[in-house]
Amino acid sequence: MSDTQEKKQFVEDLTDQADDFSRWYLEVVRKAQLADYTPVRGSMVIRPYGYGIWEHMQRLLDRRIKATGHENAYFPLLIPESLLQLEADHVEGFAPECAWVTEGGREKLEERYAIRPTSEAIIGHLYSRWIESYRDLPVLLNQWCNVMRWEKVTRPFLRTSEFLWQEGHTAHASEPEAREEVLRMLEVYREFIETELAIPIFAGKKSDAERFAGADETYTVEALMRDGKALQGGTSHHLGQHFAKVFDITYQDEAGKRQYVWQTSWGATTRLIGAIVMVHGDDQGLRLPPNVAPVQAVVVPIWRKDEDRAVVRGFVDRVAQEIGAVVRLKIDDRDQYSPGWKYNEYEMRGVPLRLEVGPKDVASQAVMTVRRDTRAKESVPLAALATRVPALLAEIQASLFQQAEEFRSQNTTLAGSKAEVIAHFEADRRGFVAAPWDGSASFEAEVKEKTGATLRCVPFDLSRFGSLERPGHRVALFARSY
């Protein structure tokens, strides 16, 4: 089979986005070897390539978390039911999703343990022991862990019973300080997702109906997928003093009086990997942002005659010497696959840059580069690789963000009334709809009941929504979502 035939067959095996986006997504997750199903209900295995993406995301986000003064810790996976029940709104919000441990070995436990759905309860209990004085504040902790939420309908990365995340939990002496923390960490998420994942974000406040169980306020970063649905990329919660009063988290202030602390929590999960797939992917598979790609550039040696093998292989070694220290590089010299097959494998897996090296390239002392985002080709001299390849990766990162931003702009509609919002979604149109919102629960409930769309957030940045501002109203973004 020729390279062209192999490419055609490989591409034909992948469903087009326009035909069935959901099926396309599942096929890409499988073909790109990001994840696979397991015998455990609702739980996936994240394969090495998918976990490699998560490792780079974790490294880049963890750096930002620590730069804002936070430290990492680890709290128990199991949470006593009695602790969860102390905060009524919290337990009511998570009870349908809790998985319970009822036996230890062959003995029935006296008290059930919830497998961690989130950690506010156990952390609140421990903070009540650790915090004594205003000198102990603020407490700024983060943990990287897995959580379990017993989902009825699951989809790899987007909604699974078990997933990986980070959750930050902080305690402060004053409400303004806690509020500052909430907004600071929301900005960390926005900047991280836009800079490293190349995904444009709407940041804003959730409505009361959509806020986290037990929180005073919830803030969110929202992204738009290629099928026109929104995805929540991370949340930051102002917990007020609810958990402090429930778990008796107090401190002695400078005047010697006991005061309740003010708390926050914030988190982001592996569903961001799903967002990368759905924002940047195309009909050939993944298109990974270079900043989080496990392999940023792949070298494909090309030879047809045995006598060319050693020459090409020797030149490939020189390429690795030039750029191996500045990019995450892979050399694919497998004999059992043709160059055409390899091209399509790495297109499917979203490797940002392909470097082709054949006898003609060796003769000209250059490498042919092929971008995954645009398929543009460029011959780069060996001596220039160490500067040009990182520059190309930066261009690809910026290009992916620009394409995603243009798509979001084209699929963000302004509506002047609730009726226009409903009409938009009833016509099966996609994307975000911005509209004046009177702040009532009935407004968003009617939109949700009639269309399935929810109020995603009240955005901070109104630069593109100025025409919608009304006295007594706030601009709100509506969308169908994951």
PLM regions with names:
Residues M1-Y482:
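NTP/phosphate- and nucleic-acid-binding module
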